[in-house]
């Protein structure tokens, strides 16, 4: 059965066993935000704090992201926030290609249900997100990279500033 709502799809994500990652995690992290979101943010994969809570971007990178959203008058509660990979990776390593492949259809279905006007892809792994015609995609750096590197922080801030201006 093809899920018709985000809630239906969330349940499928929580019970997914298509790759090895579920074995060493506490929670799948499907994403959160309203089904009628006009903006979606896509990261790489959940970290430790996200694995504990089952919610995306609640750790240090999430706090930084929230600050940048607020500075640009973007209310996080109106945005759908998720990752291309739905489980934490061991030692926060970059997801392997087969892990991205296993999760990408979930993300594509999420975006197909929401049909946001814009999707911000944060980081090189998220840039692999399959595109849906009619949605504008914006590629930027991941918030964790923006926190560590001045040049990337500048780009991240500029990208969100441009997003808020559109």
Residue ranges and their predicted role:
Residues 1-166:
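A polyanion-binding, active-site-adjacent surface
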């Amino acid at each position: 059965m093809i899920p018709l709502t985000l809630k239906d799809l969330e349940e499928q994500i929580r019970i997914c066993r298509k790759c090895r990652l579920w074995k060493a995690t506490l929670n799948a992290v499907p994403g959160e935000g309203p089904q009628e979101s006009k903006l979606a943010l896509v990261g790489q994969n959940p970290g430790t704090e996200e694995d504990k809570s089952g919610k995306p971007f609640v750790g240090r990178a999430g706090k930084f992201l929230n600050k940048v959203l607020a500075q640009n008058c973007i209310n996080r509660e109106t945005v759908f926030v998720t990752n291309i990979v739905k489980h934490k990776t061991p030692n926060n390593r970059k997801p392997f290609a087969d892990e991205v492949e296993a999760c990408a259809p979930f993300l594509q279905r999420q975006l197909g249900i929401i049909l946001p006007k814009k999707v911000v892809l944060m980081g090189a792994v998220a840039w692999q997100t399959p595109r849906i015609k009619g949605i504008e995609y914006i590629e930027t750096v991941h918030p964790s990279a923006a926190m560590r590197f001045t040049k990337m922080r500048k780009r991240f801030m500029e990208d969100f500033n441009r997003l808020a201006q559109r």
